[in-house]
């Protein structure tokens, strides 16, 4: 493949290759401020490629590959090439990373302490993280929270934030256009647009944080909150982890310490602004 880009996000060094120039051009623009891999080996290789040579030009169909693949995954149209590249990068980390316990979660930090937000697609965790990250919080990650196996510290993984549908307009109004990727339509999740994290999140990607609150958000439901007991938090987090089973005892120990030491709360909210206000109120109580 003649089109490539190498860069680092937190502890992961990515080598991304493509049969097409367009997706790599998008990656180079959006990841322009991330460190390169000069003199360092990549820890994850992602590829987006044509199923057959002629599919580079005739009805291009983008297949996701790399160190790890899903053989029966359906191809994407070339118009969704950036999304395919991001999905390929996610796949390599989800299936291959063993240095941390991975939680499918977003996370933000303030004063060295972090909130981990866990929820299914549509729960609003990405939008909450994006909005908090534009305020007094530092974004640690949108896709994965990386928990240390020995020290309970979160390693930042500030990839592009995947904005979806209504959340796009909310963020477009408050960030400069150069931090936004192309509008991607026709995806299974609707309209997607990627947002580059603020400069401080990228510059401080090697500064870890201590988990201080586990949050389980639900967007669109009845407003309110309830404490989540450690047993329930443990089960929810095992469901959200992509490598808990593969890690074995170290993963179990890390997750047990997390739910033992960190309070957990479930919140419902009807709007993003209401969600942000609820998070800030919870944080104020935690610090009181």
State each model region's role.
Residues 1-3, 57-58, 102-104:
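A short, compositionally biased
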Residues 2-29, 41-43, 106-119, 134-288:
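Glycine-rich, often acidic-flanked micro-motifs
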Residues 34:
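Acidic-aromatic/histidine active-site loop/patch
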Residues 42-94, 283:
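Charged, amphipathic alpha-helical linker segments immediately N-terminal to NTP-binding catalytic cores
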Residues 93-96, 200-202:
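Short, P/G- and charge-enriched loop/turn segments at secondary-structure junctions
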Residues 94-110:
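Pre-Walker A adenine-sensing motif
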Residues 123-124:
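Conserved glycine(s) of the Walker
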Residues 128-129:
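Post-Walker A alpha-helix
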